[in-house]
């Protein structure tokens, strides 16, 4: 009877245990132990950066570039340029020496001397590679100061709201004064510094404004000088272009006038067909071609090769002839060549002395040339011809 009661109690207890809430799983302690083991395994393995750096420093093939010091407590980068060019790409996939130095700083390495790249760490020693697992990366928490600064900056405007009275003077309300007085004693120390900071900022901004204004004035002056120089250059270019065009036009006119003059002189054309030109110099009265005199008027055989005075290519050395009947004078200009020395050929010297040199009026060549002493020319001509010889 007692055995049955005990069995019932045991069965009831099992049922009660079965009907109750489930207990936590038994493998929980084992999992915690496994987690501890993983953490210990992670701490025993150094980071890849430290492992590669140790291999790089401990390699004797590159001792001329990077190596341990004499006692093995530090390592020295002897040739930073070659180290960044040849070794960093092989181990760290980059060639930035500054990035390598920043990585060393994050792991607690410090520079020993300022004149060379020598770094040291208490757990980075020659022959003690097992100490690398004790080197941990520094935790950088920059957002905390930034958040604190932002909170302080946000608290300052709320602590100093400004209201205006009826007369327009700004005052602080009583509630705001109570808040500022009941707060911690630090705000009174910060509040006086705010005007000083703003004042320094105002001074700095004022200096920057003055500098900007000075630069604006200098830029404006330079712009004015540049515009003046551009205007001067444009005027010079315009003047030179006008001068060049004028010179070309003058040269073309001179060449065309010279060509027209040569054509008129050589072809024997009258002055009426050509454009009247200004009177030339005395030396320009000579003909430009030797055939102009013979083309203008035929001469006798004994006077053919002799020089005679010409005006605009027409000989003016022949005298006016009279008709046999003594009629009206011929309006056409009939002249004959006279020798330059004034000596007649075929007569004695006495008749040459009595013969006077003909004087002509300066008339255009297309009008008949009349002699002032025509009678003397007639008598001289008759004497030369032999008709009035007495």
Curated annotation (Swiss-Prot):
The Gene Ontology terms for molecular function here are: DNA-binding transcription factor activity; sequence-specific DNA binding
Post-translational modification comment from the UniProt entry: Exhibits temperature-dependent phosphorylation.
Q: Where in the cell is it found?
A: Nucleus
According to the record, the residues making up region (Disordered) are 165-212, 322-363
- Could you tell me which cysteines form disulfide bridges? none
Q: Where is the composition biased (Basic and acidic residues)?
A: 323-350
Q: Where is this region: Hydrophobic repeat HR-A/B?
A: 215-244
GO cellular component terms, A-Z: nucleus
- Per the record, the major location class is nucleus
What family is this protein classified in? Belongs to the HSF family. Class B subfamily.
The task this protein performs is described as:
Transcriptional regulator that specifically binds DNA of heat shock promoter elements (HSE).
Q: What is this protein called?
A: Heat stress transcription factor B-2b
Lineage of producing organism: Eukaryota, Viridiplantae, Streptophyta, Embryophyta, Tracheophyta
């Amino acid at each position: 009877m007692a055995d049955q009661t005990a069995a019932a109690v045991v069965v009831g207890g099992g049922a009660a245990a079965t009907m109750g809430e489930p207990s936590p799983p038994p493998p929980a302690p084992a999992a915690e132990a496994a987690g501890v083991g993983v953490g210990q395994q992670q701490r025993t393995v150094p980071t890849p950066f430290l492992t590669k750096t140790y291999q790089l420093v401990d390699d004797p093939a590159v001792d001329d570039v990077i190596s341990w010091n004499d006692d093995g407590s530090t390592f020295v980068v002897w040739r930073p340029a070659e180290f960044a060019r040849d070794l960093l790409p092989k181990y760290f996939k980059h060639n930035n020496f500054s990035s390598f130095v920043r990585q060393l700083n994050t792991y607690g390495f410090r520079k020993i001397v300022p004149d060379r790249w020598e770094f040291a760490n208490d757990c980075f020693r020659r022959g003690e590679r097992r100490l690398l697992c004790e080197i941990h990366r520094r935790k950088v928490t920059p957002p905390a100061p930034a958040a604190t600064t932002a909170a302080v900056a946000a608290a300052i405007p709320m602590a100093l709201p400004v209201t205006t009275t009826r007369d327009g003077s700004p005052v602080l309300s009583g509630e705001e004064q109570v808040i500022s007085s009941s707060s911690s004693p630090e705000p009174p120390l910060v509040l006086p510094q705010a005007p000083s900071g703003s004042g320094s900022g105002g001074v700095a901004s004022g200096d920057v404004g003055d500098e900007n204004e000075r630069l604006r004035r200098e830029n404006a002056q330079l712009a004015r000088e540049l515009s003046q120089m551009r205007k001067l250059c444009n005027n010079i270019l315009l003047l030179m272009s006008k001068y060049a065009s004028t010179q070309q036009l003058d040269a073309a006119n001179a060449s065309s006038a010279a060509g027209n003059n040569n054509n008129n002189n050589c072809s024997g054309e009258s002055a009426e067909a050509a454009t009247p030109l200004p009177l030339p110099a005395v030396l320009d009265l000579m003909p430009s071609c030797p055939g102009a005199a013979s083309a203008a008027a035929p001469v006798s055989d004994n006077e053919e090769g002799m020089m005679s005075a010409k005006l605009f290519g027409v000989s003016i050395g022949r005298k006016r002839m009279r008709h046999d009947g003594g009629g009206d004078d011929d309006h056409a200009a009939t002249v004959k060549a006279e020798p330059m020395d004034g000596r007649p050929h075929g007569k004695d010297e006495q008749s040459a002395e009595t013969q006077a040199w003909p004087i002509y009026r300066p008339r255009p060549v297309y009008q008949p040339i009349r002699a002032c002493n025509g009678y003397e020319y007639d008598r001289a001509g008759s004497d030369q011809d032999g008709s009035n010889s007495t």
